[in-house]
Amino acid sequence: MEKFSDAVSEALEKAFELAKDAKHSYVTENHLLKSLLQNPGSLFCLVIKDVHGNLGLLTSAVDDALHREPTVVEGAAIPKPSPSLQQLLLNAQEEARSMGDEYLSGDHLLLAFWKTTKEPFASWRKTVKTSPEALKELIIKLRQGSRMDSPSAEENLKGLEKYCKNLTILAREGKLDPVIGRDEEIRRTIQVLSRRTKNNPMLIGEPGVGKTAIAEGLALRIVQGDVPESLKDKHLYVLDMGALIAGAKYRGEFEERLKSVLKGVEASEGACILFIDEVHTLVGAGATDGAMDAANLLKPALARGTLHCIGATTLNEYQKYIEKDAALERRFQPIFVTEPSLEDAVFILRGLREKYEIFHGVRITEGALNAAVVLSYRYITDRFLPDKAIDLIDEAASLIRMQIGSLPLPIDEKERELSALIVKQEAIKREQAPAYQEEANEMQKAIDRVKEELAALRLRWDEEKGLIAGLKEKKNSLENLKFAEEEAERTADYNRVAELRYSLIPSLEKEIRLAEEALNQRDGRLLQEEVDERLIAQVVANWTGIPVQKMLEGESEKLLVLEESLEERVVGQPFAITAVSDSIRSARVGLSDPQRPLGVFLFLGPTGVGKTELAKALAELLFNKEEAMIRFDMTEYMEKHSVSKLIGSPPGYVGYEEGGSLSEALRRRPYSVVLFDEIEKADKEVFNILLQIFDDGILTDSKKRKVNCKNALFIMTSNIGSQELADYCAKKGTIVDKEAVLSVVAPALKNYFSPEFINRIDEILPFVPLTTEDIVKIVGIQMNRVALRLLERRISLTWDDSVVLFLSEQGYDGAFGARPLKRLIQQKVVTMLSKALLKGDIKSGMSVELTMAKDVVVFKTKTNSVV
């Protein structure tokens, strides 16, 4: 028989390489032994560990023996197998035949080594005190009835240890986070596991609601003994799909590995429970060219009840993969894991707070926990509690931890001040005049003073860092003592429990309390080690782009004078400006309805009166740039099918994967001004989509994903009823009543929009035609924009009243509003100035004054210092 397992073939190759590298003429059994010991995960080493053999001692003895081997000169022949190695392999083959195996594996080699009289193995074997017969019995037991019938069979022994992680051991070592809440789901899981057949729970829930945590909670309960007798002393293994797939080169190798895991679970006779996270990945795994997938390997064992298995998957994957396979579905008992309530999520965070405080070395306030849950629930709508709230706490704590390690702002400012003084002193030293000597002395005194202040600040910083580091160390020690107390209670070491519970732990808790008080009582602290609600709000703002931080004084002042700011750009529309300003103010202080958008407005009026300009002005005030506005020209949505442009194409159509222009824009920038320009041009189907957005603040796209629209401000513009509006204003004059104006345009609105659409609009705002006084103000606004562009070239621009009068008279048209005015300024002013700049008549540093000469705008220049 010359069939070797993959592991033995690899070991023989390495043995030849070792002999060649060491310039040995023969490959001996010691070279083979050395190569086998270099793979601690091999069957050879695993069996030695099971008989409590000292691998380190054996490795040292083999190294010494190889050093004593004679070497040959350069260019000698390739080393040949020694007679003793050949005899060892023959003995191993005999062991393989006696055990009915087709392939020679590591355990056969170990049995052959066990009978050898060659040193150093013979001397080392005496330290183990295990007979060859006992070793053979152990190997047979270890194999659990499997035979070496393939080259990879050796790799698949001990499949549980190789391809799974033991959660029970991790729980016993204190490496799992505490599982708070979820008692009902854990009890239901235990109930299903206690059944005679089909004892396989399937945890189904959205990502981040705590499915994996339920499995970890079960492992913690098993360790604590808080389970029924049927589950006591059980081991919970989690399947590592990465390890299972990695390195599976040949067809059938993946299935063989999975089979070895299942065999290990079955052979334990109920002592092992297998947890498969993302169980849907097994459906279809390994299935090529009509071969069975991995899920089919599970079915027989699941049906018999010999395999205790807990699965976990999301609702979508369960419907997509598991429900399609009815035979697999009926072998699992579904347990639905719902998202916890806000109160339960806060309760979960309280349980995890200590772990995060110890890891980051910070203090997390109760307010921060509440803020993390409430703000994540309101603003991060595409994820689920408690995962998103835990992530907020973790990121906020890491931000504080990073700041503790960075240079505090007061020290940074002092260092900059010191650098500036030293540079100034060096400049003064270069001046030889006696008059500068006194100034140099004063400068030296200032440098000495700043150095003293900097030294004092650094000393305070070092002290605070030391206190925080000491506090973190004490909290770590406290956690270790609490873990030791639990361990002692499990092993019934009650003397140790009493010592820890009533002496060591209270003493350390008192030290921590005193250290925290000492840290809090320090005046003028340089380091902030507390995570509060303001920091949580900052992290939410960084994630979503929604400014949810508590309003700063500057922002409050800006919102109070919002009307004045808007009136600087939009003239003659007091109704619209007041209504929009009130909506934004109520939203920013948190008093608006959280289940609806910030505001839904319909701007009605003739063209060129400032409807679109007001939307642009809002975007600039809220986001500091006009481009932040999401604008849709509704003339592009006149066909019935064009609704797919907004929410995405349906499945099977071109562009399905790309998403919709509205849904994707709001997903990326949920806090936006959304403008639907000329809404009356859109098809009726578009209005049906908008109903859902305006009422619930939710948009469902073509992929059934919900997009949060509750932080957006929606503005629609329309020309409906503009003629009636113009006629009414012409009769009544400039001062008009808003309700009276709306009553004029109401019939036209009802003819075009459905009642349910009108009912969802917060306010319909009429834009009245502009008066002559309004046009004069607009001339000033437009001319100021031209002047600002020239100021960038260091050119000052002024104009007299005659220019304003000419432009306002020539640029106003009742039918077109203020738009012709912009074109007139472009033709009469901007074009003239552009030509003068190109000719060199106007240069940088000049002042330009515009005036009228025979109905033509002309300019005068004079040289002036313009900054």
From Swiss-Prot:
Q: Does the keyword Repeat apply?
A: yes
| Region feature (NBD1) | 158-339
Note the SMART domains from the entry.
AAA (SM00382), ClpB_D2-small (SM01086)
NBD2: annotated span = 555-769
What SUPFAM superfamilies does the record tag this protein with? Double Clp-N motif, P-loop containing nucleoside triphosphate hydrolases
Residue ranges of every copy of the Clp R domain listed in the record: 1-145
GO cellular component terms attached to this protein's record: cytoplasm
Residues annotated as region C-terminal? 770-867
Classification via InterPro entries: AAA+_ATPase, ATPase_AAA_core, Clp_ATPase_C, Clp_N_dom_sf, Clp_R_dom, ClpA/B, ClpA/B_CS1, ClpA/B_CS2
Q: Where does ATP 1 bind?
A: G205, E206, P207, G208, V209, G210, K211, T212
- GO BP annotation list: cellular response to heat
State the source organism's domain of life.
Bacteria
UniProt-annotated stretches for the region Linker? 340-545
What are the entry keywords?
ATP-binding, Chaperone, Coiled coil, Cytoplasm, Nucleotide-binding, Repeat, Stress response
Q: Any idea which positions bind ATP 2?
A: G605, P606, T607, G608, V609, G610, K611, T612
Q: Quick one: where's region Repeat 2?
A: 81-145
The UniProt subunit note reads as follows: Homohexamer. The oligomerization is ATP-dependent.
Q: What is known of its domains?
A: The Clp repeat (R) domain probably functions as a substrate-discriminating domain, recruiting aggregated proteins to the ClpB hexamer and/or stabilizing bound proteins. The NBD2 domain is responsible for oligomerization, whereas the NBD1 domain stabilizes the hexamer probably in an ATP-dependent manner. The movement of the coiled-coil domain is essential for ClpB ability to rescue proteins from an aggregated state, probably by pulling apart large aggregated proteins, which are bound between the coiled-coils motifs of adjacent ClpB subunits in the functional hexamer.
User: What is this protein called in UniProt?
Assistant: Chaperone protein ClpB
